[in-house]
Amino acid sequence: MNYTIKSPDSLKASVKLPASKSICNRALILNALSYSPYEILNLSDCDDTEVMVKALNSNDRDFDIKAAGTAMRFLTAFLSKVVGEWTITGTERMKNRPIKILVDALNALGARVEYMEKEGYPPLRIFGSALQGGEISLAGGVSSQYISALLMIAPLMENGLTLHLEGVVISKPYINLTLQLMEQYGVKAEWNGQTIKVRPQDYHPIPFTVESDWSAASYWYSMMALSKNAEIELLGLFKNSLQGDAAGAKLFAQLGVGTTYTDRGVVLKHNGNRTKKLNYNFVNEPDLAQTFVVTCVLLNIPFRFTGLQSLKIKETDRIEALKTELRKLGYLLTDSNNSILEWNGERCEPQAHPVITTYEDHRMAMAFAPAALVLPEGIEIADPQVVSKSYPHYWRDLRTAGFIIIDNEQ
């Protein structure tokens, strides 16, 4: 299935964004660890969260988390401390996403996790038991989800956890998010320099409501940046958000988008400012990178983006995917060191009728959709259903905002 998205005559939207996937997935684990009687409010209905809900509410011993990378990491750690024998698997892509660093760390802390097929990759067999805990070291450059997975079960280890992070720590806001949510559930950690300590202690159940997703908001910021005339209100966003991706508001200010906070959320307006070149390190906000890459080239703003190392191991190799798909639209990007992507304004002949491949990656589909605002023929996107991973109502919300969306198979 392909969608062709065409620009509205005028873009007007008041959007109820999906709940933050990052907060949902952490809150679900913490709710389970605290044996909470409370139902989490405003829980996302995206694929990743539904996979986690199903697993945590299941009496099964075998779990298929499909393409949900966060669920794979968080549940692997969670199940390692739940007495019993468990298996966890996923899609073929998931079976090629490395998990050795987390498995080694868990086993060093007293867990017993084994590989069922290829060394270092899912599927896994987990023999859950009480964990001794102790002291381990991890490279700071590993996925923050490995670190978060360990931290959330740390207070329930016999000796707690002392975690030394070596080198540059990437995605710090996601680690901070985990620690802030743990504190809301009654567990305090100490983060001094490169070391995080969590002593043995109990979680306490609390009523919890999830805030809206700043990552999802970024696509609407892109639409505002690319539009000549638009009125956009995004509901459920807070200025003092727990989410690191809230930094996108300040960054989009350099692309001409102003943010006004209200008691309902935020209102977007053109601010009259637009940088001539954008340099930024996305090490703390990797999920915003695709949105800014696509927005910048369509605004004809050269850029140099660093800190993109985690993009190589996401749903797809996002660096290669961006280069390939933007070449179809006539833009030549270069990358280096597996972590830098830049565009100096170089163009090439665009394809006559480009179709954007999404690589089973929800963020590819959502980042490219705003291109409809500047491309005369609109933009055609393959496998648009991939958005269900994090923002199931994305296309419905675009239609409500005035976009014309044509299902090319009907």
List each language-model region with its residue ranges:
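Short, structured segments at the rim of ligand-binding sites
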Residues: 1-410
